[in-house]
């Protein structure tokens, strides 16, 4: 169900600068999970998808990495091989240093050499700041890739 919910939002676009969304229905749903204008929204998008699919969303935070930490504290240990519907979490890397900022998305396909995601607040280059909900092909690269370092996955229950 998570994958289907995520796919239903493909193409949703923001108003430049994280000011809101072109679809007022989508904006209303995002505000219900905590989004407000000016905020990065990848974690809010992932929370919305998991909420609509009936998953536990209590550990979610506006921060991708904090969300990962919260799920681990709640007993949902991170894994290195995801299932469809899993959360995938990255941390930003600047000048070789891990930052507290990051990015989060939903895995829709998991293969041996790559995985496919649907992510909010992404761009055509795959970075953490973007303009829309988009599908991405990602590698299991545990080093920095496009300014992001893969941290792990939280599988759904």
Q: Which positions does each model-derived feature cover?
A:
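Tryptophan-centered motif/residue detector
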Residues: 41, 48, 76, 90-92, ...
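A short macromolecule-binding patch
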Residues: 126-137
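Intrinsically disordered, low-complexity boundary segments flanking structured domains
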Residues: 75-78, 135-141
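...with weaker cross-activation on analogous glycine-rich loops/strands in unrelated enzymes
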Residues: 3, 55-127
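Helix N-terminus capping/helix-initiation residues
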Residues: 20-24, 63, 139-141
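Low-complexity, Gly/Ser/Thr/Pro-rich intrinsically disordered linker/tail segments
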Residues: 138-157
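N-terminal capping segments
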Residues: 1-55
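Residues that form generic nucleotide/phosphate-binding pockets
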Residues: 5-9, 29, 67-74, 156
């Amino acid at each position: 169900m998570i994958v289907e919910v995520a796919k239903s939002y493909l193409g949703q676009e923001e108003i430049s600068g994280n000011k809101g969304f072109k679809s007022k229905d989508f904006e209303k749903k995002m505000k219900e999970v905590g989004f407000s204008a000016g905020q990065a929204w990848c974690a809010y998008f992932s929370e919305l998808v998991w909420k609509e699919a009936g998953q536990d969303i209590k550990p979610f935070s506006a921060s991708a990495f904090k969300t990962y930490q919260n799920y681990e504290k709640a007993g949902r240990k991170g894994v290195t091989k995801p299932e469809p519907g899993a959360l995938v979490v990255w941390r930003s890397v600047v000048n070789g240093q891990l930052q507290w900022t990051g990015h989060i998305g939903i895995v829709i396909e998991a293969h041996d050499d790559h995985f496919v995601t649907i992510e909010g607040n992404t761009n055509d280059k795959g970075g953490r700041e973007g303009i829309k909900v988009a599908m991405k092909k990602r590698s299991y690269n545990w080093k920095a890739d496009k300014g992001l370092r893969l941290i792990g996955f939280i599988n759904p229950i």
